[in-house]
From Swiss-Prot:
Catalytic activity: uridine + ATP = UMP + ADP + H(+); cytidine + ATP = CMP + ADP + H(+)
Organism: Clostridium botulinum (strain Kyoto / Type A2)
HAMAP family recorded: Uridine_kinase (MF_00551)
EC number: 2.7.1.48
The protein, known as: Uridine kinase
SUPFAM superfamilies: P-loop containing nucleoside triphosphate hydrolases (SSF52540)
Gene: udk
Length: 206
């Protein structure tokens, strides 16, 4: 097995980056592709009271354990198995369990700040930024956090205005300049997804 092809997929919250990642993932046999979500690498906060965890800024680069993420990506590149963390969004903390991830021909790395850290960028073979209008993104975030993460409408809106939007403008949007490909319209852009799949297949054949 040769070195895996690493694909970084980023974009603002609710941009459709997870949809793009899943669309690409589903185009390949499960035996040859793996998914690494940056959300799984939020720092362990076991020593922090729950009330404090609720107030933390989770859209800032410091919220992520990039040291562990980079170590895991390098291990996958070296064809080693890793134990990927599992993050509990309701408890705002890592679970004790992990998920075993085996090295595959294709590794997708997906998250809001995947292109922000130069150490992560240099490991990626393809860098994708999913670009979607802000009003669409906030509606998607609202629906997701209420339905999947046990949040209230007021808490989601307050977090968006005080944290999510400022962090998007400061860290996520500027990382667009590092992308090899910018995909508009999120996961609904079938042409872009099909082009990416063709490009990945070409890289695998080289």
């Amino acid at each position: 097995m040769k070195r895996p092809v690493l694909i970084g997929i980023t974009g603002g919250t609710g941009s459709g980056k997870s949809t793009v990642a899943k669309e690409i993932y589903n185009k390949f046999d499960e035996a040859c592709i793996a998914m690494i979500e940056q959300d799984s690498y939020y720092k362990d906060q076991s020593s922090m009271p729950f009330e404090e965890r609720c107030k933390k800024n989770y859209d800032h680069p410091d919220a992520f354990d990039n040291e562990l993420l980079i170590d895991h990506l390098k291990n996958l590149i070296d064809l080693n198995v890793i134990e990927k963390p599992i993050y509990d969004f309701e408890a705002h903390n890592r679970k004790e369990e992990t998920i075993k991830v085996k090295p595959r021909d294709i590794i997708i790395v997906e998250g809001i700040l995947v292109l922000q850290d130069p150490r992560v960028r240099e490991l990626l073979d393809i860098k994708i930024y999913v670009d979607t209008d802000a009003d669409v993104r906030i509606i998607r975030r609202l629906l997701r956090d209420i339905n999947e993460r046990g949040r209230t409408v007021d808490s989601v809106i307050n977090q968006y205005l005080t944290v999510v939007r400022p962090m998007h403008m400061q860290f996520i949007e500027p990382s667009k300049r590092y992308a090899d490909i910018i995909i508009p319209e999120g996961g609904h852009n079938r042409v872009a997804v099909d082009m990416m799949v063709a490009n990945i297949k070409h890289l695998l054949q080289e």
